């Protein structure tokens, strides 16, 4: 059985918790076990939690869940640039997929709400990559 971990940002909690529920339901639909869920303050805080999950031999891959909504400055771009880069680095370092389920940057709250299903897409991406890596 495939076992995944999830890292969820609490910032924009109303959106990320809906994303988490969709992701968990979809993982169950796919027959995938969600082994651990770690909650972090915001998307910028994810890399350390991702690393902790990747170090666990019982976890095949990690799904990230967050919503980076545009504010009055370019802070949202800095967050996404750094988090996405570090997520890729960790995936390559541990040879396990880390799926980007963080919506943004540059989106409004309304757009973030419309993109809640992005969490399901991240689960699907993670599972596909796990299967690919296990088959070769």
From Swiss-Prot:
A Pfam family matched in the record: DMRL_synthase
Residues annotated as binding 5-amino-6-(D-ribitylamino)uracil: 11, 43-45, 67-69, 100
CDD domains (UniProt xref): Lumazine_synthase_archaeal
Pathway(s) the chain acts in: Cofactor biosynthesis; riboflavin biosynthesis; riboflavin from 2-hydroxy-3-oxobutyl phosphate and 5-amino-6-(D-ribitylamino)uracil: step 1/2
Protein origin, superkingdom: Archaea
Enzyme class of the recorded protein, top EC level: transferase
GO molecular function (one): 6,7-dimethyl-8-ribityllumazine synthase activity
Positions with a binding annotation for (2S)-2-hydroxy-3-oxobutyl phosphate: 72-73, 115
Any one GO cellular component localisation term in the record: riboflavin synthase complex
Role played: Catalyzes the formation of 6,7-dimethyl-8-ribityllumazine by condensation of 5-amino-6-(D-ribitylamino)uracil with 3,4-dihydroxy-2-butanone 4-phosphate. This is the penultimate step in the biosynthesis of riboflavin.
Record's protein name: 6,7-dimethyl-8-ribityllumazine synthase
Organism: Picrophilus torridus (strain ATCC 700027 / DSM 9790 / JCM 10055 / NBRC 100828 / KAW 2/3)
């Amino acid at each position: 059985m495939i076992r995944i971990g999830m890292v969820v940002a609490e910032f924009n909690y109303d959106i990320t918790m809906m994303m988490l529920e969709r992701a968990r339901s979809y993982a169950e639909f796919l027959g995938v076990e969600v082994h651990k869920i770690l909650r972090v303050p915001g998307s910028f805080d994810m890399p350390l939690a991702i690393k902790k999950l990747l170090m666990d031999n019982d976890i095949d891959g990690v799904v990230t869940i967050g919503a980076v909504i545009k504010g009055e400055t370019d802070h949202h771009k800095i967050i996404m640039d750094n988090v996405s880069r570090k997520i890729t680095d960790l995936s390559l370092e541990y040879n396990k997929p880390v799926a980007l389920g963080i919506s943004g940057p540059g989106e409004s709250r309304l757009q973030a709400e419309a993109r809640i299903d992005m969490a399901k897409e991240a689960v699907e991406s993670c599972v596909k990559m796990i299967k690919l890596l296990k088959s070769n």
